[in-house]
Amino acid sequence: MAVVKCKPTSPGRRHVIKVVNNELYKGKPYSLLLRKKSKSGGRNNNGRITTRHIGGGHKRAYRIVDFKRNKDDIGATVERFEYDPNRSSNIALILYKDGERKYILAPKGIKIGDTIISGLRAPIKTGNTLPLKNIPVGTFVHNVELKPGKGGQIARSAGSYVQLVAFDEEYATLRLRSGEMRKTQSNCRATIGEVGNSEHMLKVLGKAGASRWIGIRPTVRGTAMNPVDHPHGGGEGRNFGKHPVTPWGIQTKGKKTRKNKRTDKFILRHRRK
């Protein structure tokens, strides 16, 4: 994998930094694991904008990725790695010994032809999936479940991982990249190793049009708007003369937004500021 800085042959190329991976499959994705994916444009079922800065972008097909990894004690061979437009990490197409194919998140360090397996007593090897209670303390894992059997929810983006730091009766303690320490049931599953494509963070789009290709619309400053559009709008000059707020008048700097108090008891230490 190489990080390539483009030559400034035009203003749109001057700042572009690409991540080139020659291992990615150049053909079409596996058709049996594709589904139609429609765009919302950031609107809800009433047609109202609920998420700003979303719209347009290239058409995508959804790749069905196996986050549960619950096909136990059947070995699978890594056939190829593919680009997935719906996530920052790459995906791997694996072929089980019984002939079934599935997509999984491509872990860092595995190669085409490697064998991986899931199960209660799977070896501690990159790409294998097993319950947290059977994984040694200190191991880096990804695609970690929060509820047994629901499928991995933590550490799925490019280059991410969590570290297993302790066990306490029926719970395992995890240290997240953010610094948060949280508990989850020890019979939840996780995959050994880190998610691949960690160079994704070095990628620079380089121009506004590249953001439009991936469905991101412009972000306009509130102070550049009219008073009818934003609390910061209007007035002479650039000063808006009040504490910064959202377009709906809610404090925007430092205000806590977490509402899920039901799971607060599982968070031992909140993330670092």
Swiss-Prot record:
Its domain of life?
Answer: Bacteria
> Which PROSITE patterns does the UniProt record give?
RIBOSOMAL_L2
Keyword Ribonucleoprotein assigned: yes
Q: Name one GO biological process term.
A: cytoplasmic translation
In which residue ranges is the amino acid composition biased (Basic residues)?
253-264
Which GO terms of the cellular component aspect does the record hold? large ribosomal subunit
Per UniProt, the keywords (alphabetical) are: Ribonucleoprotein, Ribosomal protein, RNA-binding, rRNA-binding
GO terms for molecular function, please?
Answer: rRNA binding; structural constituent of ribosome; transferase activity
Which InterPro entries does this entry report, sorted A to Z? NA-bd_OB-fold, Rib_uL2_dom2, Ribosomal_uL2, Ribosomal_uL2_bac/org-type, Ribosomal_uL2_C, Ribosomal_uL2_CS, Ribosomal_uL2_dom3, Ribosomal_uL2_RNA-bd_dom
Q: Where is this region: Disordered?
A: 224-264
**How does the annotation summarize its subunit structure?**
Part of the 50S ribosomal subunit. Forms a bridge to the 30S subunit in the 70S ribosome.
Task of the protein: One of the primary rRNA binding proteins. Required for association of the 30S and 50S subunits to form the 70S ribosome, for tRNA binding and peptide bond formation. It has been suggested to have peptidyltransferase activity; this is somewhat controversial. Makes several contacts with the 16S rRNA in the 70S ribosome.
- Please state which protein family the record places this protein in: Belongs to the universal ribosomal protein uL2 family.
Q: Which PANTHER family match?
A: LARGE RIBOSOMAL SUBUNIT PROTEIN UL2M (PTHR13691:SF5), RIBOSOMAL PROTEIN L2 (PTHR13691)
The protein in question is named: Large ribosomal subunit protein uL2
Q: Which organism is it from?
A: Buchnera aphidicola subsp. Acyrthosiphon pisum (strain APS) (Acyrthosiphon pisum symbiotic bacterium)
